[in-house]
Each structure stands twice: as C-alpha cells, then as structure tokens.
C-alpha cells in the first residue's frame, strides 16, 4: 500500500552533482510509480533546477520518503525519486 503524505511545502534542488550521478537526466513521472507499474515519464530535467515539494511517498513502513511530488519551471508538476533531491535550508 502506498503511503502518500502531504507535507508543508519546502524547496529542494536538483544539483549538477545529482545530474552527473544519474547520466545528466532526472525523469519526472505522472504518478509515484515505475514504468513497470504503469507510470509514465512526463518530463526530463537536464539542468540544475529548484523545485517545490508538496507530497512525499513513504516506504512500506511509512517512515522514509521514496518519491516526492514537485512543482517547477512555471507550473510543471510530477513525481521524482527522493534521492534525486537536495533539500535547501
């Protein structure tokens, strides 16, 4: 069962270092699911980008974030793997 939790919005960033670690691209998904589970890539972030996080999908125990719902770039929205974000502040 997915544990999706609304969180107080916070700013995070996809850094150049993160992009380099993942071959220069962070995929943005329409849902917090993988392609195998029916998720579709709706965008690809290829440059350092500041995002606003509004929801987090927790692991099966409900404790660790696995994916984050983000808004960025003039109204774009989707889900990214949590490990691809660096929290600001």
Q: Can you describe what each PLM-predicted range is?
A:
Residues 1-34, 38-47, 54-57, 61-64, ...:
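SH3-family beta-barrel domains
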Residues 73-74, 89:
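Short strand-coil-strand connectors
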Residues 51-53, 75:
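Hydrophobic/aromatic side chains embedded in well-ordered alpha-helices
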Residues 68-72:
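SH3/SH3-like beta-barrel fold
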Residues 74-84:
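A short macromolecule-binding patch
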């Amino acid at each position: 069962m997915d544990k999706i939790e609304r969180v107080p919005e916070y700013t995070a960033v996809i850094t150049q270092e993160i992009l380099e670690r993942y071959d220069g691209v962070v995929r943005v998904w329409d849902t917090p699911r993988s392609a195998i589970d029916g998720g579709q890539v709706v965008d690809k972030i290829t440059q350092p980008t500041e995002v606003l996080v509004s929801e987090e999908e927790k692991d099966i125990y409900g404790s660790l974030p696995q994916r984050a719902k983000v808004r960025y770039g003039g109204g774009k929205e989707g889900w990214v793997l949590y490990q691809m974000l660096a929290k600001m502040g």
